[in-house]
Amino acid sequence: MDIRPAEISDILKQQIASFDQVETVSETGTVLSIGDGIARVYGLTNVMAGEMVEFEGTGLKGMALNLEADNVGVVLFGDGDSIREGDTVLRTKSVVEVPVGKGLLGRVVDGLGNPIDGRGPLTDVEYRRAEVKAPGIMPRQSVSEPMQTGIKAIDALVPIGRGQRELIIGDRQTGKTAILIDTIVAQKPVNAEGDPKKSLYCIYVAVGQKRSTVANLVRTLIEHGAMEYSIVVAATASDAAPMQYLAPYTACAMGEYFRDNGMHALVCYDDLSKQAVAYRQMSLLLRRPPAREAFPGDVFYLHSRLLERAAKMSDANGGGSLTALPVIETQAGDTAAYIPTNVISITDGQIFLETDLFYRGIRPAVNVGGSVSRVGSAAQIKAMKQVAGKIKLELAQYREMAAFSQFASDLDAATRKQLDRGARLVELLKQPETSPLPVEEQVVVLYAGTRGYVDPIAVDKVVAYEAALLSELRGAGSDILTAIRNDRQIKPETEGKLKELLEAFGKRFSA
């Protein structure tokens, strides 16, 4: 047989030239054990803390939290029943990223930002890390713009500013969520103006709540036309603990998009007690050492790194803001427990809601003495300052006198007058759910209360008086409301008109 070397070498050259090396290199690990939503994985030596990993063949994702010498502790974002010992785990080489942007407005998403409202995929969004470092000192400025809640007791006595963190704390069933919903609904007239520098986009995050509760809340927002400028993030009680742990950070990242683009956002965390419980569950299952109340040692950092991301940015940094309203549920009014004291120390003030007040029909059940805003009147318009300063003092004196009068048999006229005025002011601060008032209407109502126009009215008629007064103002007194809204203060000529209206209305109401 005739062998031709030249021909063979040509064939070899062609083979070598046409050889195409296609290979995919992926770092993998192996499941050592699985149980209670925790997977122990061998391998993945270069995995990052907080990195997303994927379990091959199941599509299930997890997050690497414990990086130990011989294995990695992974928490699962779902049910791990389909995972078996020996399964392959793949690195994604990315830390948890969530969708942000205006495309989320009006949508309901889960703890990772995936839509769960059945309205198709998200559009007009970009992706950001769920956990980022909070802004430093220099990019911030002090809180100066009011964030109106529409609730008289809060806007007058415990004012909240844009960029502030105000804790809402109280036992279960005291109206904590109602305050959040009212605040979101109260932004409708502001957002209707369409001014991006004034609009306030709202994000509500439900942690560990019933699905039926979240569905009712979404329905309420839709009924009041508030869903169009709101995002609901829901990590319900049936979701895995890592989803409940992550949901507040996801919501915060969504709010930061607005803050960093010179807009204003509000994030309502309902509630951080359940997030702490979910984190405790994960930490104990990962065998991290427990501390007080079995919480891990870094549970303070869990909440501080979240709430520090709320800020009012300086004008050089766009002047945007992110306001935080975290909620903490107490057990039998015990505000000295571990998580309540932690969050009280992190926030810029707190609104205490009391069961006793709630059952006495004083709703919202705000304990005025125990509630405080560390931003104070810097977060109020001048008109509100003109009427609110007096109401604080009168309510404080009323509480003192009411306690004293229980033991005194006969009271002098001045004390009796103070008690009567206080009782009427308490009635005046009552407000039904989902009926927030614009700030100019609040100012007029409180003006009537502090200047003695409500004193002749019987205590049980005060609520009816207020409703009738507001109706009168929206009709005959609309110019007064417009003047207060535009001037942001009660000018002498406006005050003259207001006094005339209140005197005439008082006579008609009492007749």
Curated annotation (Swiss-Prot):
Residues the record marks as site: Required for activity: 371
This enzyme's EC code(s): 7.1.2.2
Enzyme class per UniProt: translocase
Catalytic activity from the UniProt record: ATP + H2O + 4 H(+)(in) = ADP + phosphate + 5 H(+)(out)
Sample GO molecular function, one term: ADP binding
Locations listed in the record: Cell inner membrane
Primary location recorded for the protein, binned into one broad class: membrane
Pfam family, one: ATP-synt_ab_C
Topological category with respect to the lipid bilayer: Peripheral membrane protein
GO cellular component term, pick one: plasma membrane
Residues reported to bind ATP: 170-177
Alphabetical keyword list: ATP synthesis, ATP-binding, Cell inner membrane, Cell membrane, CF(1), Hydrogen ion transport, Ion transport, Membrane, Nucleotide-binding, Translocase, Transport
Function according to Swiss-Prot or TrEMBL: Produces ATP from ADP in the presence of a proton gradient across the membrane. The alpha chain is a regulatory subunit.
Quaternary data: F-type ATPases have 2 components, CF(1) - the catalytic core - and CF(0) - the membrane proton channel. CF(1) has five subunits: alpha(3), beta(3), gamma(1), delta(1), epsilon(1). CF(0) has three main subunits: a(1), b(2) and c(9-12). The alpha and beta chains form an alternating ring which encloses part of the gamma chain. CF(1) is attached to CF(0) by a central stalk formed by the gamma and epsilon chains, while a peripheral stalk is formed by the delta and b chains.
NCBIfam families reported in the protein's UniProt record: atpA, PRK13343.1
PANTHER family on file: ATP SYNTHASE SUBUNIT ALPHA, MITOCHONDRIAL (PTHR48082:SF2)
Record protein name field: ATP synthase subunit alpha 1
